[in-house]
């Protein structure tokens, strides 16, 4: 391992990862170093390996000018709300390089591991996930299919808030829905139709409120949205410092940045147990 590798920095960038995840990271970094002809695994190898694991492999496709610009605004919407929403995880990287199934990605991760969930945090997750769609609405007065995975995440979080975590006054502090992935295929789970309808109404209310918040925040900070999108178009990928600088949001003063020890929770992927404390939004 090269002397420039800061293991504390590596640990800080991998909250929630278990031993197998870290072993995979080290192996991937070693493979990258070997391909590059390096005798030692360096900081850049670790950074690129983490990016590949978390964000996915780069896809060799060429976007049109219009699609590239729209993707930049979509990701800037996610990122700017991550910076401005109280309690949100810090934005670590924003990119408009196509990876996996996404045309762009915004990566957020907390400074420490998280194991609990607060309603404020979960609402912030929904607001941030709706940021890409909201940015498209503001800039283009139209939306695309790029928000598909965002809407899946939004719906899952809101349904669990209402049906499992007691975060709806109308439904009350009871768990009326089964855990994700354990639903009865015939709907024979003992939940009355009227209760299901109430859950649906509350889910829609929460999502609508968060959507309104996303639109209002991005509209109020339109100049910052434009600056961030233009920086993305110029560089394609922005790291944490570059993203906050482009948006002119002081990193240490951003309302989305929590002090250490003041972390309310991390939501796992829909249907999966908690693993890595990271939020990835893509278009």
Residues covered by each model-derived region:
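Short pre-active-site segment immediately N-terminal to the catalytic Zn-binding motif
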Residues: 61-71
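Conserved C-terminal "switch" segment of AAA+ ATPases
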Residues: 1-47, 52, 56, 61-62, ...
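A generic alpha-helix surface/boundary motif
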Residues: 4-8, 27, 75, 226, ...
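Single-residue recognition of alpha-helix capping/boundary positions
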Residues: 5-6, 21, 45, 67, ...
């Amino acid at each position: 391992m090269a002397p420039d590798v800061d293991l504390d920095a590596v640990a800080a960038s991998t909250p929630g990862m278990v031993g197998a995840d870290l072993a995979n990271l080290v192996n991937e970094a070693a493979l990258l170093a070997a391909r590059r002809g390096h005798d030692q695994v360096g900081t850049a190898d670790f950074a690129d390996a983490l990016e590949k694991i978390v964000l996915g492999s780069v896809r060799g496709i060429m976007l049109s000018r219009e699609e590239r610009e729209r993707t930049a605004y979509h990701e800037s919407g996610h990122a700017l709300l991550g910076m401005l929403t109280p309690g949100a995880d810090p934005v670590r990287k924003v990119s408009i390089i196509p990876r996996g199934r996404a045309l762009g990605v915004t990566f957020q991760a907390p400074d420490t591991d998280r194991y609990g969930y607060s309603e404020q945090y979960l609402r912030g997750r929904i607001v941030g996930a709706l940021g890409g769609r909201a940015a498209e609405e503001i800039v283009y007065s139209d939306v695309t299919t790029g928000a598909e995975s965002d809407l899946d995440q939004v719906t899952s979080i809101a349904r669990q808030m209402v049906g499992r975590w007691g975060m709806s006054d109308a439904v009350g502090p009871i768990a009326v829905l089964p855990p994700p992935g354990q639903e009865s295929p015939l709907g024979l789970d003992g939940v009355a139709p009227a209760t299901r309808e109430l859950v649906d109404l509350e889910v829609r209310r929460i999502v609508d409120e968060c959507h309104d918040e996303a639109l209002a925040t991005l509209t109020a900070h339109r100049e910052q949205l434009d600056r961030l999108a233009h920086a993305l178009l110029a560089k394609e990928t922005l790291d944490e410092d570059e993203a906050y600088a482009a948006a002119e949001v002081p990193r240490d003063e951003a309302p989305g940045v929590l002090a250490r020890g003041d972390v309310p929770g991390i939501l796992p992927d829909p249907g999966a147990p908690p693993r890595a404390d990271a939020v990835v939004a893509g278009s």
